[in-house]
């Protein structure tokens, strides 16, 4: 699969989660921050990244850079939904994603909602099964969306092409 060039896309970023972590040293605690960021162009391209730094803005910037290197293309149908139901898995995190009819909206938790909105999916039903950790939810949703194929790809793969 060829790499998607982020410079050709009009990407917007959303911070999903910021956490403060502490390293215990002889003189006390040294704090730093990690930021989980999702980027997307609202027309099928989405990526996520994790940035770590001593300051929050720098961690977000690093997360955005990482996310731009980690872009995938999601097949979004004419209903602004996914073509079929799928379960994304990562670690203990599992997320069930179901296509929805027009007008349903994004029915998803915070971390998954960010990915769907960044990808331009505006009608979807989802449920987090297992871990609710934002890192696992984002990675599971991303993995599920990465495995989606268009109906044309499926018919060609099954040898049903007309």
Curated annotation (Swiss-Prot):
Domain S5 DRBM: start-end pairs: 11-74
Name of the molecule in the record: Small ribosomal subunit protein uS5
Protein task: With S4 and S12 plays an important role in translational accuracy. Located at the back of the 30S subunit body where it stabilizes the conformation of the head with respect to the body.
Keyword Ribosomal protein: yes
Native source organism of the sequence: Trichlorobacter lovleyi (strain ATCC BAA-1151 / DSM 17278 / SZ) (Geobacter lovleyi)
InterPro entries (alphabetical): Ribosomal_Su5_D2-typ_SF, Ribosomal_uS5, Ribosomal_uS5_bac-type, Ribosomal_uS5_C, Ribosomal_uS5_N, Ribosomal_uS5_N_CS, Ribsml_uS5_D2-typ_fold_subgr
Keyword Transport part of the UniProt annotation: no
Alphabetic keyword roster: Ribonucleoprotein, Ribosomal protein, RNA-binding, rRNA-binding
């Amino acid at each position: 699969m060829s790499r998607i060039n982020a410079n050709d896309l009009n990407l917007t970023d959303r911070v999903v989660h910021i956490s403060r972590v502490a390293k215990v040293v002889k003189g006390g605690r040294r704090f730093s921050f990690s930021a989980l960021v999702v980027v997307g162009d609202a027309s099928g391209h989405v990526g996520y990244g994790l940035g770590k730094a001593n300051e929050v803005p720098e961690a977000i910037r690093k997360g955005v850079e990482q996310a731009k290197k980690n872009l995938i293309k999601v097949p979004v149908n004419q209903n602004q939904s996914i073509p079929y139901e799928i379960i994304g898995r990562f670690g203990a995190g599992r997320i069930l994603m179901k296509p929805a009819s027009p007008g349903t909206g994004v029915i998803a938790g915070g971390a998954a909602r960010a990915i769907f909105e960044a990808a331009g999916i505006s009608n979807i039903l989802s449920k987090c099964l297992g871990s609710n950790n934002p890192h696992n939810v984002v990675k599971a949703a991303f993995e599920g969306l990465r495995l989606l194929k268009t109906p044309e790809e499926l018919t060609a793969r099954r040898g049903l092409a007309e």
